[in-house]
From Swiss-Prot:
Organism: Archaeoglobus fulgidus (strain ATCC 49558 / DSM 4304 / JCM 9628 / NBRC 100126 / VC-16)
Database matches in InterPro entries: METHMP_CycHdrlase (IPR003209)
Gene encoding the protein: mch
This protein's name: Methenyltetrahydromethanopterin cyclohydrolase
Keyword Lipid biosynthesis belongs to the record: no
Subcellular location: Cytoplasm
Taxonomic placement: Archaea, Methanobacteriati, Methanobacteriota, Archaeoglobi, Archaeoglobales
Length: 316
């Protein structure tokens, strides 16, 4: 069986060979665990963002960055595809593990989840778990973890601390922006699973999503990076069997659709649980049904809200 941790660990080792070029910095802690700073105290880079995203997806995706325009304004876009969508997206990339140790907090994603089974029901659903002796986790945080945090992760994954790698990037960073846009296929797979579609029926997924400009703080950046997916992210999916429920996947089916996410979050008194979960989805999907040969298109792109979120200033 494929080991997302073993494949991802090879990518991390490649990153460590090119720290200066990638503008990242690694540190071996006293317990042997390796922390890779991808944007906390270093600038990071687009290439680091690509590799970070590949690590998050357990090495089971191809990720690149291209430049395209939205209403004649140039933007960088993440493009990606995976032929193992359930494992790469739900079994690895999904930010399904909240890391809380003393005062340290981070959203954990990546292959280590498949060892710790966070959350267990996800792995029962996709019928997958990893049994590697190395664990690779990606932490969305503005602080680097210490030995105690890495010890906790190692224990949950049932591996030795010296066999744990943690990639760390804040939301408001180059790598942060890239890796969140790199979740565009995952948001589609996640939503499909949430509304009752069997993720094991998804054969492949390919997506494209603009990379948010880096905003002034993590809170604003959280808004703009989510808006990248919700208002301009598009996904092409190949499935064994189409289902009418898939028309409910795009973000425009949400009652909260139509405003920048930061405004929605602020109106909800910064309480995620007050926001309609249907909002967290791609703007548009196209679904190719292998049973009939038809391709069904749902959703729409919305440059107007995206430009508000990105704080775009156009010449008069």
């Amino acid at each position: 069986m494929l080991s997302v941790n073993e494949i991802a660990a090879e990518i991390v080792e490649d990153m460590l060979d090119y720290e200066e070029e990638l503008r990242i910095e690694s540190k071996k802690l006293e317990n042997g665990a390796i922390v890779v700073d991808c944007g906390v105290n270093v600038p990071g880079s687009y290439d680091a963002g690509i590799m970070y995203t590949q690590v998050c997806m357990g090495g089971l995706a191809d990720v690149d960055i291209v430049v395209d325009t939205i209403n004649d304004v140039p933007f960088a876009f993440v493009t990606e595809y995976t032929d193992h969508p359930a494992i790469a997206c739900l079994g690895s990339q999904k930010a399904g593990w909240q890391i809380k140790v003393d005062k340290y907090f981070a959203m954990g994603s990546g292959p280590a989840r498949a060892l710790a089974l966070k959350p267990k029901k996800t792995y029962e659903r996709i019928e997958y778990e990893d049994d590697a002796d190395v664990a690779v986790i990606a932490l969305e945080a503005n602080q680097l973890p210490d030995e105690k945090v890495m010890e906790f992760i190692a224990k949950e994954c049932d591996v030795d601390p010296e066999n744990v790698y943690a990639l760390v990037a804040p939301t408001a960073s180059i790598v942060g922006s890239v890796q969140i846009s790199g979740r565009i296929v995952e948001t589609a797979i996640f939503k499909m699973n949430e509304i009752g579609y069997d993720p094991k029926l998804i054969v492949s997924g390919a997506g494209r999503c603009p990379i948010s400009p880096i905003l002034e703080n993590d809170l604003k950046a959280m808004g703009s990076t989510n808006d990248s997916m919700m208002y301009y992210g598009s996904v092409f999916l190949t499935v064994k069997k189409y289902d009418e429920i898939l028309k409910n996947v795009p973000s425009c089916t949400s009652r909260d659709y139509g405003k920048p996410f930061y405004e929605i979050f602020k109106a909800a008194n910064y309480d995620f649980y007050k926001i309609d979960p249907n909002l967290f989805a791609p703007a548009q999907i196209a679904v190719n049904d292998l049973e009939t040969g038809k391709t069904y298109v749902h959703g729409k792109l919305n440059a107007e809200v995206l430009f508000q979120s990105y704080q775009i200033v156009l010449e008069e």
